[in-house]
Amino acid sequence: MQLEDTIAAIATAIVPQQGSIGVVRLSGPQSLTIAKTLFDAPGNQTWESHRILYGHVRHPQTKAAIDEALLLLMLAPRSYTKEDVVEFQCHGGIMPVQQVLQLCLQQGARLAQPGEFSFRAFLNGRLDLTQAESISELVGAQSPQAAAIALAGLQGKLAQPIRDLRNTCLDILAEVEARIDFEDDLPPLDEDSIRQQLQNLYQQLEDILNTAQRGELLRTGLKVAIVGQPNVGKSSLLNAWSRTDRAIVTDLPGTTRDVVESQLVVEGIPIQVLDTAGIRETADQVEQIGVERSRKAAQQADLVLLTVDAHQGWTEADQLIYEQVKDRPLILVINKIDLGRADLVSYPPEITNTVLTAAAANLGIEALENAIIEQVNQTNLSPQNLDFAINQRQEAVLTEAQLALKQLQQTMAEQLPLDFWTIDLRLAINALGQVTGETVTESVLDRIFSRFCIGK
């Protein structure tokens, strides 16, 4: 990336005929010059930082009006990137913003690369790496709780404890190196104190690492597969739960031929519900493909809803399906209780989590949601009461830091020379710095920011 360039991009989603406002963003040394060339602000409006001007975007040669717009000025260093930033706030839709963007490019700006605005904010000290990653997570949040966790990261609630840990490691390193360089002039190291500090550091890292899986649940959601025989009401269950007609419902077995997905949020947890084809032996090649996809979906799901028909009871076919999914976290859904007696369904005694539903009548959905949340809580994955959560990249480097501290404890126990202590400490310090971006490599930065949208 050429950071001395002025960059431009559309910063809002382009939705044909639907967007009410479209924003074109500029950042860099020529932002203000380009804005003054293209924007006609009538009257005595003041071109000062953090002002909004009203006027028209005009073609620089023909002076033809392109759009009636507002212009927001945020000059360095009081801007998102700490550079001169200008935003054209145009009417929504495709044509106005694309025309304005094209004019900006013709005046010397270049099209921003994905995440380049945030990358500049990071390089200029406006954001650390945890905050930059939190912006991406906030944009992609699938639930209010996921958004709250991302916002906590943006506010520095993850970065601060990581910095505190790193500073403690730096303090210990300084003490050790001082004893190496000035052994005769300083008292011996207080090894008991260092051991206690290392134990505290290790436990704090363990607490932070314990947020990883819970945070991942908020980011990616819980994958729930509805499985069972044909015509036990799986599609009706999906429709009742999602309050839509996502799946076709008929009295004919085998109607569902493929996996039907629906996105839900239950108590702040995003849930991806998979309505699968009825599992049975069939000569129909298309249905066979659907059945195989059902088996695969069940094996990849975080939770399986094994659905049976209360009217039919527990059948040999139900037992065969159960044998295929019993190694997965499972809830038995006894459906169609309005047509049969649930107490007559003789399911295996090891199944302890059951829910009674009549999906066609919208009965039992709340009980099903409660059972799912209870299942999540039992696995210690509940995202409730999280102050922040780390992502997979952060988990990997924090694990490296923890391993380095553990190695240092072993190094001390073996009474190895102080030079060996510094090796372990530097590994821990480097890993902690990768979380906030103080020691991160260019390739890692490229990978992180390439996942952003262009206008970010």
Curated annotation (Swiss-Prot):
Cofactor(s) the protein needs: K(+)
Residue positions binding GTP: 231-236, 250-256, 275-278
Keyword GTP-binding annotated: yes
InterPro entries: G_TrmE, GTP-bd, GTP-bd_TrmE_N, GTPase_MnmE, MnmE_dom2, MnmE_helical, P-loop_NTPase, Small_GTP-bd
Subcellular location: Cytoplasm
Name of the coding gene: mnmE
Listed CDD domains: trmE (cd04164), TrmE_N (cd14858)
Function: Exhibits a very high intrinsic GTPase hydrolysis rate. Involved in the addition of a carboxymethylaminomethyl (cmnm) group at the wobble position (U34) of certain tRNAs, forming tRNA-cmnm(5)s(2)U34.
Organism whose genome encodes this protein: Synechocystis sp. (strain ATCC 27184 / PCC 6803 / Kazusa)
Assigned keywords, A-Z: Cytoplasm, GTP-binding, Hydrolase, Magnesium, Metal-binding, Nucleotide-binding, Potassium, tRNA processing
Details of cofactor binding: Binds 1 potassium ion per subunit.
EC number(s) recorded for this UniProt protein: 3.6.-.-
GO term, biological process aspect, one: tRNA methylation
Binding sites annotated in the UniProt record for Mg(2+): 235, 256
Binding site for (6S)-5-formyl-5,6,7,8-tetrahydrofolate: 25, 87, 126, 456
Pfam families: MMR_HSR1, MnmE_helical, TrmE_N
Assembly notes: Homodimer. Heterotetramer of two MnmE and two MnmG subunits.
Domain TrmE-type G: 221-377
Chief localization: cytoplasm
The name this protein goes by in its record: tRNA modification GTPase MnmE
